[in-house]
Regions:
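Gly/Ser/Thr-rich loops at beta-strand to alpha-helix junctions
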Residues: 66-75
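Long, low-complexity, Lys/Arg-enriched
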Residues: 1-62, 76, 83-122
Length: 122
């Protein structure tokens, strides 16, 4: 399954291995512009941007889209994608505690490991 990345972040190696493709060039620049709101958006602004992002996904030929970002945009984007027959996926990751020795000191950090996708069908 081809999954278009509709987030502002580059797909991880694990996500790429599962079929995620990042937008490139002008399409990526357009996506970032559409995902970033300057000032308080109206419902019309949100709806229009969701429609335009879904159009980018449709033009890519992807069967599914990995989405994430502003919570007020996601329901609109989900509907716009589903209206075009594009499956909606959210990345699911687990927090993994990692200990490393740095200069003789144990440093504990948390890393997020991609596990898979949650498909939203409502």
């Amino acid at each position: 399954m081809t999954i278009i990345n509709l987030t502002q972040h580059i797909a991880t190696h694990e996500q790429v291995a599962q079929g995620v493709i990042d937008l490139q060039g002008d399409d990526l620049a357009q996506l970032k512009k559409l995902l970033n709101f300057v000032g308080m958006p109206t419902n019309g602004d949100i709806h229009d941007r969701a429609f335009d992002i879904a159009r980018l996904a449709d033009q890519s030929g992807a069967e599914a889209a990995m989405i994430g970002g502003a919570p007020y945009l996601m329901p609109h984007l989900q509907k716009a994608l589903q209206a075009r027959g594009i499956a909606v996926l959210y990345a699911f990751s687990e927090r993994v505690s990692v200990e490393r020795v740095v200069n003789g000191v144990v440093v504990k950090t948390n890393e997020f490991k991609h596990v898979g996708f949650v498909e939203v069908t409502v």
